[in-house]
Amino acid sequence: MAGVNEIRSTFLDYFRKNGHEVVPSSPLVPRNDPTLMFTNAGMVQFKNVFTGLEHRSYNRATTSQKCVRAGGKHNDLDNVGYTARHHTFFEMLGNFSFGDYFKEDAISFAWNLITREFGLPKDKLLVTVYHTDDDAANFWKKIAGLSDDRIIRIPTSDNFWAMGDTGPCGPCSEIFYDHGDHIWGGPPGSPEEDGDRFIEIWNLVFMQFEQQTPELRIDLPRPSIDTGMGLERIAAVLQGVHDNYDIDLFKALIRASEEATGVKAEGDFRASHRVIADHLRASSFLIADGVLPSNEGRGYVLRRIMRRAMRHAQLLGAKEPLMWRLLPALIREMGQAYPELIRAESLISETLKLEETRFRKTLERGLGLLSDASENLAEGDRLDGETAFKLYDTYGFPLDLTQDALRQRGIAVDTEGFNVAMERQKAEARANWTGSGEAATETIWFGIKDKVGATEFLGYETESAEGVIASLVRDGVEVPSVREGETISVVVNQTPFYGESGGQQGDTGTISGEGFVIAVKDTQKKGEGVFVHIGEVTEGTAKAGDVVELKVDSARRTRIRSNHSATHLLHEALRETLGTHVAQKGSLVAPDRLRFDFSHPKPISAEELEAVENLANEIILQNAPVTTRLMAVDDAIAEGAMALFGEKYGDEVRVVSMGTAKHGSKAGKAYSVELCGGTHVRQTGDIGLVRIISEGGVAAGVRRLEALTGEAARLYLEEQDERVKAIASALKTTSADVLDHVNALIDERKKLERELADARKKLALGGGSSDGDSAVEAVNGVNFLGKIVTGVSPRDLKPLADEGKKQVGSGVVLFIGVGEDGKASAVAAVTEDMVGRFSAVDLVRAASAALGGAGGGGRPDMAQAGGPDGAKAADAIAAVKALIA
């Protein structure tokens, strides 16, 4: 029986032997395609090839493409776990022809693979064709020997594919497998086609037309082929099972889930194990491709997937985060085919663990509220949409989790009412938002672009240039002229000023002409390639059409260049030190500092920070040239250039390289290679020095470095040195001996603190006076020690109570600690032999009530509480004694 990995390899090897380029799967986040949230088909990475906008070095390709369908119209989330073939993550096997072979070869390749390589019986196979596609029908007869009754003509759009309202399109031919008459269902096109007997295993798309208008469709000069076969589906067929979740891959993941929870995948728990197995794959691959859980966009979809799995983990009785413990099983099954799982293992593991830990409280609270809201509902009823929306809006409990939780009780959710409530909230938010003047001006730049064209950027070669004012904007309105004292925006036909993008701040400087000067305070990129110089007219009057001289603040630009280049070096140094899962998540390149956000699941140690800084400075000391090349984006990535997650790139990109690696697999090659449109130093030595000044977390799985370069770094080190000298002077020692003196002071302080704590403990246990009962006394035949103490922190009360239990031998202990702010903390303890008679929780709650507090908690033998009124400490002791009596 062939396993999933063997089936994948067989497919790719077959097409490689037949002249196809084996192309790696593209990321789950499509590059340069804002129309898609996730890659959901094999052809996505080739879309521009099919439309003629991009050319590859090959005209035949084959892939095993990672896909996610969990958002928008391709949303299978609610069905996952409850059906045999719904998944959020799946692999799409495919072969593609870009104007090379067409229908006959595509059908021949497909038929030979499934019958000869995979060995499927011919009598188990049938096909569909578009009802007017006689060519495809004839080729199936010729190549496969299929009779007319096994070639079904379908007149609907199910067998005609289109990329959109316009563009490439063409008929499809689908291959179906017959699981046998013991399963209900009819062939495609029949009234029973929705049954599970006949399952589509491969779709062949014949791109032969171009839809120019709704009424006009013409032949493509170079017809192409796009096919897709779900790996999980064909694996089920080849392994003799009818359910995708019974293939070897899912069996291994479900087995790991069973072992981790101690619950078999049977009965009501079967769906939960399946949900966890599927969602583990989707979550892990999305994180590996740079998506992190958040409250918007792709990150929100990921969070929904993760939280749905966590809800099912809770149903299985998991008391601790579960999914990260299953990651090793996934890596064993898929890590060889997709090494990004291995590369990002640490990030995936920590992200899963952190998200589940954070969500646990929300889940418990939400399920409790949902239980209360639905307690009077019976099977067949519906939870009203307003309640579902309140759970979502107020308590952060997603709609799909509400639906999932109620599904087991046969209760539906009024999704229409939920959507009405959601839209009402959005409308209220829009009505309450007044907007801003800046936002109101955004659309003006598109009109200016249409009128005068994009700005030509000259700033890579020069910091000064001449140009012509193309447009002047004041208060969001285009004006013919501006005068002294006015704050305005200027568009020039060409500029050396860099417009803010990629984290690099925009340039400042001056724009001057005959009789006027404009002080540029910022430069932004607006619309599509319009550079907007924002500033104030400091002298004279400027008019549209005036010839101007543009001068960038050179000193400021130099500092920005240094910080930007240092950012690249730090990025690579982080990857070398922490692992290749590190990816840029944001940056700020300013003249006075740099800030770099990156993916990493935990704080960086001092030793790791030092290693990162040393690696970056090592490249700076090389004084190596910083080179820039213009390349096609795919060629650049193929050469190893790092593309930033979420960044949009044109057909041609700038590739910035710097330094020579001295360590690891990159030794002797360029140290840092990134796609970047910013400005950089000419030699790494121009950076001078990089100094990391802080590191911390900014979001789940995202860390932030702040650093200085050049003169700013030197001044920072000088300031640090002055501080050390000042400390040394205060300690009457030298800078070299400061650390020894500080450590000695710390040791002495710890010693004094221990002595003070011991003295307070002795006093609390009977030495000295107190404001309440201090000695052990008998209350209703029970030994009781009650004591009010001051100068003892709340965390030290429990050790005191332990000592008190030893002193009473058998009985009850109560300590009330009163702080300098007048608030009180209370600890009650009950010896083991008395736990059956008294609960420390009940006792401490009585004390808390007397102190003006409420609640308290812990174990039957030890509990803690507090209260705002320490003056009532004696009353608290009396209240506990009353309970004992």
Curated annotation (Swiss-Prot):
Localization: Cytoplasm
Keyword Zinc: yes
Pfam families membership: DHHA1 (PF02272), tRNA-synt_2c (PF01411), tRNA_SAD (PF07973)
The protein's Enzyme Commission number: 6.1.1.7
Primary residence: cytoplasm
Catalytic activity: tRNA(Ala) + L-alanine + ATP = L-alanyl-tRNA(Ala) + AMP + diphosphate
PROSITE patterns membership: AA_TRNA_LIGASE_II_ALA
Keywords: Aminoacyl-tRNA synthetase, ATP-binding, Cytoplasm, Ligase, Metal-binding, Nucleotide-binding, Protein biosynthesis, RNA-binding, tRNA-binding, Zinc
Broad enzyme group: ligase
This protein's record includes keyword Membrane: no
The organism's place on the tree of life at top rank: Bacteria
GO CC, alphabetical: cytosol
Entry cofactors: Zn(2+)
Co-factor remark: Binds 1 zinc ion per subunit.
Function: Catalyzes the attachment of alanine to tRNA(Ala) in a two-step reaction: alanine is first activated by ATP to form Ala-AMP and then transferred to the acceptor end of tRNA(Ala). Also edits incorrectly charged Ser-tRNA(Ala) and Gly-tRNA(Ala) via its editing domain.
Domains: entry comment: Consists of three domains; the N-terminal catalytic domain, the editing domain and the C-terminal C-Ala domain. The editing domain removes incorrectly charged amino acids, while the C-Ala domain, along with tRNA(Ala), serves as a bridge to cooperatively bring together the editing and aminoacylation centers thus stimulating deacylation of misacylated tRNAs.
UniProt record similarity statement: Belongs to the class-II aminoacyl-tRNA synthetase family.
Protein name, per record: Alanine--tRNA ligase
Biological source species: Brucella ovis (strain ATCC 25840 / 63/290 / NCTC 10512)
Lineage of origin: Bacteria, Pseudomonadati, Pseudomonadota, Alphaproteobacteria, Hyphomicrobiales
Gene behind the chain: alaS
